[in-house]
Amino acid sequence: MLKLTDITWLYHHLPMRFSLTVERGEQVAILGPSGAGKSTLLNLIAGFLTPASGLLTIDDVDHTTTPPSRRPVSMLFQENNLFSHLTVAQNIGLGLNPGLKLNAAQQKKMHAIAHQMGIDNLMARLPGELSGGQRQRVALARCLVREQPILLLDEPFSALDPALRQEMLTLVSSSCQQQKMTLLMVSHSVEDAARIATRSVVVADGRIAWQGKTDELLSGKASASALLGIKG
């Protein structure tokens, strides 16, 4: 379970403050206007930002100040951050061993996740030889191979065309269900959120303004629907 209690980040001396509980294995969408604090919330969970105050626990362990490298979290960005001089296999392997010295069990795990992502025939290629969708599959494989209990997505598929974006969302959702991972995804699209998350959180002005069923948001019946430009 992920729990944030009054986690506070000072942005130009103005506090953003978040309290949120997410159960293990739950898939939650984080929505809201541009500049509302959605990515800030994800970066606080990942450890890329250190809160001024508050408490963040994962499975009842305090991770408020745990460095990102030691936090049980993986994060995927729109910019996939693949190393251009490393092959697909090496980029995925970094998720298992930064020195790329993989034992037999790790090699097996790497090839299994590559097969799951549908990129097992691309392992010897460099990122520059791949399409945008293929690069995001590699980046997702690197996240999943780490087998951390929480996966954070910061609009990683927004640059993809609608059909490919839906394909990637389905792949992420099924992979998280298979590995029993908790998923939090920032998105500007309620439609995308509805594809994988039954529950949504709406962030506005550095606060969680609303949380509830994604379908309720999409129907325009929720109090926060207007924040997303949805009319009932």
From Swiss-Prot:
Broad enzyme group: translocase
What CDD domains does this protein's entry cite? ABC_ThiQ_thiamine_transporter
A single GO molecular function, which one? ATP hydrolysis activity
Q: Name one GO cellular component term.
A: plasma membrane
| Residues covered by the ABC transporter domain | 2-230
Q: Give the residues the record marks as binding ATP.
A: G32, P33, S34, G35, A36, G37, K38, S39
Q: Please explain the role this protein plays, according to its UniProt record.
A: Part of the ABC transporter complex ThiBPQ involved in thiamine import. Responsible for energy coupling to the transport system.
UniProt similarity note? Belongs to the ABC transporter superfamily. Thiamine importer (TC 3.A.1.19.1) family.
The family database entries (PANTHER family) matched by this protein are listed as: SPERMIDINE/PUTRESCINE IMPORT ATP-BINDING PROTEIN POTA, THIAMINE IMPORT ATP-BINDING PROTEIN THIQ
| UniProt protein name | Thiamine import ATP-binding protein ThiQ
| Name of the coding gene | thiQ
